[in-house]
Amino acid sequence: MITHLQGRLVEKTPTYLVIDCNGVGYWVNISLHTFSQLSDTQQLKIYTYLQIKEDAHTLFGFFDKFEREIFSLLISVSGVGANTARVMLSSLSPAQLQSAIVNSDVRTIQSVKGIGAKTAQRIILDLKEKMVKLTSDNASLVAASQSPSSKEEALAALEV
């Protein structure tokens, strides 16, 4: 699997981007969420998911690892393909989507074009526990990153 691409942004549209990595241009499908998060800087790093089918190899790109994780979970649901997952991440942010699944909010998920009641219920049924676990994992990572380091604690103690 190609986990990320780092290089020069050649072209950016709401549905795809082209990134030049050492002379090789990669066409990467993106969501509107990723499009809105990317600045027009020349250099960028994009996290990827490579879908391999018998007729095509398709790269999907994400602004961060969290969005890629949500995408991977969505495509694990029967009846949700990569393009449907991309449309879902274009309509709702990863955090909104996660919240809707954790809170069993069928209406929010159904608001995405192409998602009916049965598919929304299947997504909630299949992913609710995984999303709760993902939430607790992310919360512990955020808490750990926000706790002061030993150096910061030592400097704070010296200031007093």
Per-region residue spans from a language model:
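Glycine- and Gly-Pro-enriched alpha-helical subdomains that act as flexible
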Residues: 110-113, 123
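Amphipathic, charged-and-aliphatic alpha-helical interface segments
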Residues: 57-61, 82-101, 122-135
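A short amphipathic alpha-helix within small helical-bundle interaction modules
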Residues: 74, 89, 97-101, 109-110, ...
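Strongly charged, low-complexity linkers/loops
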Residues: 125-160
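Short acidic alpha-helix initiation/capping motifs at coil-to-helix transition points
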Residues: 64-66, 99-102, 146-152
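Small-residue (primarily alanine) positions within well-ordered alpha-helices
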Residues: 85, 120, 154-157
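A positional/architectural concept
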Residues: 1-76
